[in-house]
Each structure stands twice: as C-alpha cells, then as structure tokens.
Amino acid sequence: MGEVIWVDMQAIGPENSVGHKIRRLLQEAGVLGGLDAGARVALKINTAEEGYEYGLRPAFLRTVAEAVTNATEQIPTLCDGLKLVDYWRRMSGSSFMDVVSRQGYSSDTLGGNFVINGGFSGDEGNIYPCGGADTVLGGVEVGAAVCRSDRVWVLAHVTLHPLLGVAGALVNGGFECLVGRERTRVLAGIDPYPFNGSRPGRSALSGFRHRALEGHLGVRQALEGRVFYVNYVWDVTPQPEYFPFSEAPVGPSQGFLASRDPVALDAVTFDVVAETASPGGRTAVESAREAVEELLSVAEALGLGSRTYTLRRLS
Amino acid sequence: MSEPKCEPTKWHELTAPVVGDREHYQKKSWNPVKHTWGPYTQKGPAPVWFADANATNWTESMIAKTKDLFYEAKLNECFEKGDEVAIKIHYGEWNRTAVLRPEYIAAIVEEVRACGGHPYVVNDTTLSYHIFNSMAYSSYQMEGAIRHGYTSATFKCPVIVADGFSGEDDYRVELPEGLILKETYIGRAVAEADAMIVIAHARGHAITMYGGVLKQLGIGCQSKRGKYITHLAHWGDPHDAIGWPKFTDQCPGKACKFHEMCDNSCPRQAHRVLEHGKEWYPERCRLCYSCQVTCIFSGMGGITFEENYFPNAMIAHADAALGALKCFERGKVGFINCAIDVVPECDCFPWANKAICPDVGILASKDLVALEEATLDLIDQAPVSPGSVAEEKGCKVGDDKFRVVNGFSPRITMAAAEKIGLGTRQYQLTHHEPVLTPENAAKWQIRPDQPTTVRLRETFHRNDLATEVMPFRREAYNKEWVWNEWKKFDPFKGEPAG
C-alpha cells in the first residue's frame, strides 16, 4: 500500500504560500532528512514544447532545488530529455535549450544546473535491465543525468496524456527519463501526436503503455530504487507538455502530491483531478479514464507500486 | 543524418548494466566526416587579419574591432542562414582569472545571429587533470562557466557542454591522415553543428607549449574519450614509454605533506602512497594527468612526464584537431585568436600567472594554421613583460617566447598541422585600423540607429529630473583646498610634512 501526501491549496496566506506548501510537502514526506551531504541529486522536470503555455513556473521547481541544496550542500542537477518532435533534425540540443530558455527555465531561475538528460544528442546514457526474460524490452537506455546521479526526484507537471491517460509520476519517472533513441524504440512507430489524425489502435496503445512502464522499471534499476516523486497538480491541461499547444486546464489547481510509490501517487492524482474537474474539463478527464486504468493496472502488475493507497491530506 | 550501423543489443541477455567496451562502442558510433572537408587555403599564403590592442575611440574598442574582423575575414560566410553555428570557447577552470571576457564571445554571437545563424556556445568536458578540477564534471564546469560570466543571459544563446553530462556524448572520427592518432572522438554539439566559429584565448600551455585555435580543436573539441586518445594514453610499455605517468625516486612517501592529496588525485585509485615512495597499478591508469599535475602543482617531483612526451602530445593534438575539422565542410569553420592576457599557462589552470607580454590584439582567419603562425609571430615580436616568467627566463623580443617559457617550440605543432592538411603556415597579414567616421563610430554601439543622448532628450522633455531639484544646494567651501591644496599631493614628491 502506497502512502501519498497531499498539500492542497486551502488556507493560502502569508505564511502558507505556494512556496511554504511545497517545502512542507518535502518535510512531511521525510525526504530531506534522507539526503546526505554531498549527495548528487537530479531533479527530473518538464520543459514544455514551444507553443505549450501552461508549464510550471520556475519558482515551483526552484523551491525544491533550494531545499536539496540546503540538505546536500551541493547544487542539484535539473534535467529533461529532448522532445520527440522531428527527432533527427530539429531536435538538436541547441534548439531544445532555446525553447527551454524561452519558457523562463535556466540555471539562474531554477536554482540548479539545468542540463539535457542524454546530452546534446539526447542519447548519452547507460543500459539497464527492465526485469526478467518475460519483459518486452529486456533493457532500456537511461539518460546520463538521471542514471549517474545518486538520487532522482521526479517533479512531474501533471497533465492528461493522449496515449497514456495521465502524465504524472509514472510517465515522467520512466519513459521521460530514457534517452531519445530509446524512446523512439519504446514508441515503436506510434505517432505521439494524435491531433494529426493518427490515433493508434487499442492493441498498439496497450503495447506502448506496457513498454513505457517497463522503461520505468529500468530507471528504478538504474537508481536502485532511490527515486521520489512529486506530482504538481497545477494547470492540468488536456495536452501534455510535449504538445506544441495547450488548451485551458481541466479544473482548478489542487496543489502538490508526493510519494515514493508512483502507482499510488498517480492513482490518487487522477482521482483528485477527476473529482475537481470543471464542467468544461470533465469530458477530457473522463475520456482519459480508461487509459489511466490500464496504465495503473499494468504498472501494478509490473511491480512498480500499488494502486491501493493511504492519503494524508494537509491543508 | 544516417542511422548508426550497429548490431542490435541483445536485450534479453541483459542481467546487469552494460559496461561498454571498445568493440561495442565503435559499433554504436558512426563517422560524421564531411566529404568536402579540407584546409581552407588551397594555394599561396592565407589571409589573416589583425587588430592591435590599442584603442582611443569608439571604433577602436577591442569589441568593435573583433566585430570588424569577423566580417573582414569573411567569417560571416562560414555559415548559411538557418545554420546551427557552434561557438567554441574555453569555459575556464575554477579560480582562473585570465579567461576571455564574455563580451568578446557575446560580440560574435550577436553577429552570427545578425547574419541568420543559430549560435550556441560550447565546450567539452575535460579529464580530471588535477585533484580540484572543475571541468571534468559537466555540472561543475557549468558552475565555473557561470562564475566566469558565460551564461545564456550574457550571450543570449544556449551555453552547452558539448559532450554531454558525463563526457560520453560523442562521435568517433577516423584519422587515416594522422601522424600519430588514427581515430579520435568529438563532442556531439561540435560534430553536429553546421558551422563553427572558434574563439580562442591565445596563451601558453604546459603540455602543448601554446594554446590558440588549434588547441581549441585538438583538445577543446575532443570528448573525454578523445582527450584520452590525444593524451596518448597507454602508448608503449608502462615503465618506459611516453603515454604513462613517470614515477621518479624523488617521492618522499608519507613524509610529503601533500601525500593525502596525492592519494586522492587519481579517480581510478591507480596509485598509493607508501611510507617511502609510491605504489602504482598501471592496469588502472588512463593517463588523465591528475597525479602528475597534482604533484607538480604541489611543488613536488615524485610524478612527472616523460621528456619526449610533450612534442609527441603536440603532434597528436594536431591530429586530433583534424578530427574536429573533418566534421565540417571546407570553409565552414572560422577562427579568432584573442591575444589578450597572454599568460604562460592554459585556461584549465586554476590560477593565472603574469602575462609574458602586453596585450597584442585580435586576429581572425579561415585558415587556422596561418592564424596560429601569425599569432605566434606577433607574440614573439611583442615586448617581454617585466616581472613575468618570460623575463625571468631571459626571453628577448623576437625569441620564440613559448619555447623559452614552456620548453618546446609551438612550431612543432604547426609543422605537423600543415603536414596533415589543417592549413598553411604561410600567411599574409592585414593590419585592420578602423577609420573614425560617424558611421563607424555608431556601427557597433548598443543602439546604432538612435544615440542615447537623443533618447534622453525625449525622456527629459517629459520629465527633466535635474530641473525638479535645481538649484542644487551650494554652500561655502574651503577654496584653498579645492583650488590649491590638491596640487601639493604630487605622488612622486610625497605629501609635504605638516
């Protein structure tokens, strides 16, 4: 049973600002005490595609980076991998950094060293097994900034996802931590942009979800389980950050949830999003439910965590 | 870009993280060599432009002259509109003071962008070099770069470590032309660029004697793997060959006050201090220089270099430079040497000694060997700086300064470079002296089209801040002091008693 902590958006005040809430979440989760001085911590974040306008504000991530700096006396690494758009041509590290910069993300604003997970090419990493012989992938190549760190905290901007239902801890802590060519392999020909009218079939989608979650097993293997997840339920848009556009969020922002169990965390997160969706966003949320159900059940079956959870809500 | 030719990984046979071996990596790698690579100069001496370090008006600002040279040397023709243009610089070691000022780099970035290129600033990770190195680890290197003022905010373009988080994001380049090396590895942010402008701080170097644009290619563009190869790691037998540290009988063992630093200087724990002397495990050594440099920096003599190591390394780094040049079509790389703060040692040193000569100026060319030769000649012709190591060693105007200061002539590198097709040592130097005209004065200003005074005129028209508080308060003051007393403070005569 996974334990999830939720710091909601109630009682906002001068001593309970968003920053206070994020700091409290980390304290209550007990993760800061587990950081040794000198530990190299990587914070996996989302850097939105050009045209996506609901990315997290840098201060939300900086708050965590500063907490890590205080605990480890080291400047943490913040990272994200190259996006999937036109992978072989447009997605060079330089244009990726240009887009990142335009979103307001830099080492200055984020409070740590921002790097591309996988280097300029997006392909720098190491191969780790995903589990036993019955896995589809066998092993995956995890990006260098993630797999060469002592610990990884996945700071996920929660959104809906056209292929996986929801982009939260499971997606950002797994598929999104892989090197570029590995993600191409996991996609196996699936077009991640269904708005182009190329919606894959049910069977292809199920296969992709399974492979993406196996990728998460590889990441956990790389970090020997030293992974912590924070879901930012903030501006939950129908599109994920790799889309070149974004519609209005499906409901009001609900705060921040954290856990060491990505399955429990995503399960709670989707429940919270569904319960608080605005009338205009409900259709999008409900249309994602089936995919989320499959995502969570496969993740649980693979041993990534438990859908059963205890929730501690802090206001 | 073509797909890599490699055997599929046998995923289901994996039981643990894969430790890549040479065979595995080379199969994964592919060769980015361009079909039309080659030295820029096909015949005769290569044109090199030079602007000296003097400045007395707007047009003679070193930054303005750097921009002038960019166009005079036709570096703007190295790339097309829309090209990804790598701006290769050295990010500088932590506590290094003699690095290029960010303004020189920003100036070139601005012009690359103005010409339609997409610039990004790059440098590769280094090997460990010494115990407190900040450049071997990409996140440390970026902290150092920011400390030197090299940021995306300063340059208004991405600032990237070219070979990735761990220095493994690279391409293998084959070098059949090499005099020593037959392959090397280039950081991908360099190798994948459409064009490159190399901006080098021209100064000395402890291994290659001198470091300018060729050094930026021959070491600066090499990934970690490329640097190991260029260091000639593991050439010959450990006990008598050049590609290994040389352990002398001068190591005092644990009596050395630096012995703990010495033990910690190796990232592979390839040596250990004993009560008397050291124990060395050559099978662990990769020749990163850490033990040698840490020992030398500490003023000790227990670990050093083979005597013939240096000229061999100089030739090897010319080979490696060719590896970087081969990643570009002919004429797609432009070179700038900034002979400013011409100190005896490399920017990877965590300090800077006194300059061996006064600032010389800026040089630019599309032929890197000609540019290096011209830079060396101008440095040699410059006066020797008082109090510098050059003066200490008896260097005279016209001497080969870096040979006197560092031991071997950098012309060894240039001869090797010319031999393998990096360029020509013959050059034709054009001394660029900007003419002071209203157009030239305005050309490189922050707002060339609108003088600041005109802008302020508009501002003052709306709100004249001075008028609001005028007249300023004036009170009686000691006129004797203001009119006469200060004249008595002649620094050469001293303040009069009483």
Question: Where would I find each of the regions flagged by the language model?
Answer:
Chain A
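Extended, low-polarity segments enriched in aliphatic/aromatic residues
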Residues: G2-D80, V85-S315
